[in-house]
Amino acid sequence: PDAKLYVVTGDSTDWNLAQKGDSLAGKTLRLNDDGTIPKDNPFVGKEGYRPEIWTIGHRNPQGLAWQPGTALMFQTEHGPSGFEGRGGGADEVNIVERGKNYGWPTIYGKTTAPGLETPLLEYSPACAPASGAFYNGDKFPVFKGNFFLGCLRGAKIIRVVLDGRKVISQENMLEGNVGRVREIAEGPDGFIYFSTSNRDGRGSSAADDDRIMRIVPEPPKK
């Protein structure tokens, strides 16, 4: 909404980098559309920090979406994997705000510490939210303003009903019906589109995978 380019980066399998200001790993970055650095970025001129950085302390961020009406930035993020020795699960949805620290690896999931941000939503066991999108169309009035997560490991779409920053309810959709869901988006026609990711070596693929699919309302009953 501010006409800037936002980029998310993982921690490059070295979790210490997420807290290091001189590394771009494990961060949200903010740039102008020509690649230059906005002068109002939070770490511009701060010793030991790269000026591109918007937020720090991320493990493996995935999708970004801005909430209609508030312009809050929502971010989906994958929690720790077994090889890191910190268990599984703890996937997150965060509200990402200027200059804040989202904790990895000091905190993750439901753990807390002073000065570090806890997630709006946490998922254990893991559902691997690969994308997120707000619905603002007119084909599904009941979905207006809802946040949708495409989940890989969970093989489903999660619908989150929100009131600003407050979570009202959640609903699992298409669970187990289409396999791993990679990307989800609202089309210009007002329908919801999503892509599957069953041929990435981690899913069971059908003969016609992978696919881009569309969700449409049920026709009215006669």
Label every model-predicted segment:
Residues D2-K4, D11-E171, G179, D189, ...:
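Beta-propeller domain segments
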